[in-house]
Amino acid sequence: MTQPLRRAAGSLLVVGLAGPELTGLERAWLRLVRPGGIILFKRNIAEPTQTRALLTEATGLAAPHALRCVDVEGGTVNRLRDALAPLPSAQAVAAAARTLGRPALGREHGDLIGRAVRAFGFNSTLAPVLDLALPEAAEVMGSRTAGSTPQEVSAYVREFLAGLASQKIAACGKHFPGLGGAAGDTHLLTPSIARSYEQLWSSDIVPYRELHRALPMIMINHAAYPATFSGATPASASPFWITKVLRQRIGYRGLIFSDDLEMGGILKFMSIEEAAVTTIRAGMDLIEICHSPELILRGYEALLAEAERSAAFRKLLLDRARTAAHKRKRLSAQSESRPLTQKQMSALRERILRFNDTIAAASGAQTAKNTTSPVEVS
């Protein structure tokens, strides 16, 4: 197996780590795999200096220009909550923007999240959520969605992306082609969304159609859409959704990112080996394996084994790695940052808390308005 092929296979992986410091075992497999990205979770993040040191060491063992990713959407998905401050959810910010007639609140949300993730040494956040707040997914998605219509979602996301870009942080829109109709959680199973392609194209997919040029990365979900050409196959393994719809029909040119391949939404459908190969073959640029070193290594070895078996896959792997490396380089070059002083961190925390107060006050105003509004009976 040639060294360029090993480097190519590893560079298509975005991997997670066990704790706040690298272990000897992690250093060994990072040197072997040389992944294209590192993603950190709450278990990895204690405070800014420690997090920056962890990212510096891990990316030093990874592929050149490796992504440094974290999930900070606000609300329930905020890996920096304990280390910095809580942030309001997309739902709360979007609702406040509509209530107060201040769409720029979405931009401030993105700006603050951008400042926060930069302060900890990241160059990308896996946000915003572009899913619609439909009744089917209310229990699963909760406050992560900005609105129930494409117009509401696009209005918030457009502002959020501008704020994030002002801090030179790469966004990742998710979860294409839409989880608004998902009654189940893709962490646990493969939800079956019974919406037709026409319904999805004219509703769930509209924010992607409108905003794809502003999204450096888009994440594909693990739900199935049996009423479309993809049948029972999860979207993350479907060339129909990744290549035909997102790449060709919408014309997306950024990085296409899988949701975590350790999720039940795909691992209950296929093995980690099959998932790694199938998602890359379907058109994925980067695949996430976020927790288990064993599964990371199995996914990596599966890509190499398939490349050795198939000349066509070997060419695909090398081409995909070359293209993804170019895009990663462009993103990482935009996001170099210096550590904040303790005084600057305190000022950022205070600014976030003031923003929280603004959103909470708007929520109270909306509640009062709803309480005093006349009730129509139909």
Language model features with spans:
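N-terminal small/glycine-rich loop or linker at the start of catalytic domains
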Residues: 1-12, 73-95, 132-142, 172-192, ...
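Second-shell residues forming the walls of enzyme active-site clefts
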Residues: 16, 22, 43-61, 66, ...
